Each structure stands twice: as C-alpha cells, then as structure tokens.
Design a protein with these regions (language model features):
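Conserved beta-strand/short-helix segments
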Residues: 1-430
Length: 430
C-alpha cells in the first residue's frame, strides 16, 4: 500500500442536498478499483423515489438516501442520488451499502423495513434491479448490514433481531433475477446475541463471516465452549462456507482475551480469498498499545481492539492482536481489509491522549480540542507481521464528527474512504 497516495488523493465529499442531521457518511463502500464510491445518509428526509429525484421535498423524515460518486478525468463527481422506489418515513435507507468489484452493482440495506435493494449501473445510469424481501416481521433489523460478492451475484443480508437471536440471509442472482439460497443461524443462537449486525463475504461469495457482538459465551479462541454464557456481550464471530450451493458453519471464533461487554464482532472483514479475517471489538478493555501487547482486560474505558485470523485449509488460527498506538476509545468500530489482506483500516471513535491531529499522520497539525472527532488507523502486513503505518483524520477535524464510523478500502488498499456522519459543514458536493 502506498500510504503517500492517501495524502495526494484526499477529497472532501458532501451530499448534493446537505441538510442538518442527515448523517451523510453513515455507511460507505468503494468499488475494487476505487473509482466508484457509495455513501449512505440514513436520516435524509426527501420524499423522492428512485434515481435522481427531487432532493428538496423533505416530507419523508429519516427515509434515507444513497449518493454515488465516480472518478472522472475531471476528478470526483456525484453520479447519482438514489432513493428507494417505495420511499417511506423512518426506513433509514442507506444503513449499509456494498458495491461489486466493478462498481456496477450496488446493494443497499435499511434499518427498519424488511427490505434490501439492488441497483445496477449501465454506463453512468443507475436503475433499481430488485427489492430483496425477507419473510420476517418488521423491526428485525433486516438490512442493517449487506455484503455483495465481487461479481455482484451473491448477496448476504444481516438481520440481527431475527427470531430474537439474529440471522444472515444469502441471495443469489441469475441474470437480473434474485432468489434466496440460504438462511444462516449461529450454532449457539441465543436471545439478543445480535448475530448479523456485521457480516462480510469473500470475493467469490463462498465464505461468509458474521459477527454477533452481544453473544455471551465465556469461551476464548477457536471452536470453544459455546454454552457457558457468563461473559455478557463478549461477542463472537462465525465463519460459514458454501459448497455446491449448500452452506455450513466452519468456525466459531472468540477473542483470545474474552471480556465482559467487549462486543467482539461489532465489525468484520474478510480478504478476497476468505483466508484472512479481521474482527473488531470496539469495547475491549486492555491497556495495551500497538501489536500483540498484553491482553489482560483491565477496564481501560472501552479502548477497543482488532483481531486477525488466518485460515489454512479449513482450520483457523489467530495471527495478531492489534491495538492503536495511543489511548483511544472505540477502536474497531469499523474495519476494512484490502483484497490481499496486507492493508487494514480501523476506525476509532475518540482519541483520549490529547494527541489528535488533522490530515494524514498529523500533516494538518495538532487539534487538542477535537478529542472525539474520530480517527482511522492504517496497518500493513508483511508475511504475517503487522505494523501501524499511519493514521488518518479529517482535514477539518472537529469535536463529535465521528470520523471513522465507517471505512472502506479499494481492492489494492491504495484508496481509502472514511465517513464522518456528524460533520457539521453546510457545504454541498465535492
């Protein structure tokens, strides 16, 4: 990964219809080549429907919208303004977004409805291809997370309140028609585990990782005891694989230092081949700094951690335990891996040490008053060894922006997108 390119390619993106409290940047996704970006704004209020409708009629509160940007010879431009074809108040369209590798297929999740949406692009023109519906009641969280395979033909949708325990749904596309292929539950499904809050597909769609950040088992490591629920909301991750259209669970993964309320599985990311898995635990409590430090959970104000696992054949093992190099809070609230798994971006809610800067690796100078502006850390891997290479903050970092609440990397790891859903500027466009 050429980190210097981050400095050279910094762009500042706003909605074309910026309004207070729209939460533009709540979700973000990049195409494989980094030339197409989708951004969700879950509290956008327009009553428009479909593609590039009227952006100024704010009569559908919190209906949500998605904005697609593309890189052209003249730089980044907004290509499309996308709403659901059945725009409804409070649906929070754009809660999650996922682009195929070529950027021509976009999946969009909602928070409140029982629907996810698929859009396709021909040239520069977008159209709604399908509404993906579940057979469950509303308010089960269906669509809180979506992940689409590289070719756009396999879609995973999380539903963390499904039957009270959570589920993941797999849909497949043939031509332009979508159908459900699988319904996936945790091997130890329990009430309020929130299985499906985070999920990610490998490039070929044959490996699925799912987070259950409120799972309660006291186990640690790989395939441990799933029954002893004495560590409330410690969290877990599950890996399932597809063989001839049949899905089965391959691994049950816990943190190596399972802790009460650690929320392991809050975020999750897979490499393209599915052999590297990163799991975020944004409320993990050790005081360690850096790579593979001490893992004793001593209640350090929910500093957070990320864990890297590698697969050989069908066997998983932990490769690294990663913390920020400074005192932070909420490290691991968002994560993304490059295709080769050699670049990792980790979003963080707050920097508590007073060492908060703007720009790339502090190039914009010190900003001690913006402790909760948010920050994103860049890590790189050489063979199996990880280092922190850089950190990235907004060029206009301000308190409470939540920069880093969403992150996305291009396939090669050289283009990075970071959302700041509570940034306050009234600017519009790029």
């Amino acid at each position: 990964s050429d980190i210097d390119n981050f400095t050279n390619a910094i762009g500042y993106f706003k909605a074309s219809n910026t309004e207070a409290n729209d939460s533009f940047g709540y979700s973000v996704s990049l195409s494989g080549d980094g030339m197409t970006m989708a951004v969700g704004a879950i509290h956008e209020d327009s009553s428009a429907t479909g593609i590039s409708g009227n952006q100024s009629d704010n009569n559908s509160s919190d209906s949500g919208a998605v904005y697609v940007f593309s890189m052209t010879d003249a730089g980044w431009v907004q290509q499309s303004y996308i709403k659901a074809s059945n725009t409804t108040t409070n649906h929070r369209f754009g809660t999650s977004v996922s682009l195929s590798d070529d950027g021509n297929t976009l999946a969009v999740g909602t928070l409140v409805s029982t629907k996810a949406y698929v859009f396709s692009r021909t040239g520069s023109t977008w159209s709604e291809q399908a509404i993906i519906e579940s057979n469950i009641a509303p308010f089960q969280g269906f669509g809180i997370r979506v992940s689409i395979s590289s070719n756009g033909n396999t879609l995973a949708v999380g539903s963390p309140l499904d039957s009270g325990t959570g589920a993941a749904y797999i849909f497949v596309r043939s031509g332009s028609n979508w159908s459900q292929q699988a319904y996936i539950k945790a091997s130890n499904a329990d009430a309020q585990d929130s299985f499906g809050t985070a999920l990610h597909l490998s490039s070929d769609g044959n490996t699925l990782a799912v987070g259950a950040f409120q799972e309660d088992s006291s186990a640690s490591g790989i395939n441990g005891d799933q029954v002893n629920n004495s560590k409330g909301s410690s969290g877990a991750a599950y890996v399932s694989t597809r063989n001839s259209n049949t899905w089965s669970q391959q691994a049950y993964i816990k943190a190596s230092n399972t802790g009460l309320l650690a929320t392991f599985g809050r975020s999750i990311s897979l490499s393209a081949n599915g052999d590297t898995l990163v799991v975020g635990s944004d409320r993990e409590g050790s005081t360690a700094l850096g790579i593979d430090g001490g893992q004793t959970t001593s209640g350090s104000n929910f500093s957070g951690a990320t864990y890297v696992y590698s697969r050989t054949g069908s066997t998983w093992s932990q490769q690294a335990y990663i913390k920020a190099d400074r005192a932070v809070q909420g490290f691991g609230i968002s994560i993304d891996l490059s295709d080769d798994a050699n670049t990792l971006i980790v979003g963080t809610e707050a920097v508590l040490s007073g060492l908060n800067y703007s720009g790339v690796s502090g190039s914009g100078g010190f900003n001690g008053s913006a402790v909760r502006a948010g920050i994103a850390f860049v890590f790189t891997r050489n063979n199996s060894s990880w280092i922190q290479e850089s950190f990235v903050n907004a060029s206009n970092a301000e308190e409470g922006d939540y920069f880093g609440g969403s992150v996305a990397l291009s396939a090669d790891g050289n283009t990075l997108a970071v959302g700041a859903r509570l940034e306050d500027s009234a600017a519009t466009g790029v």
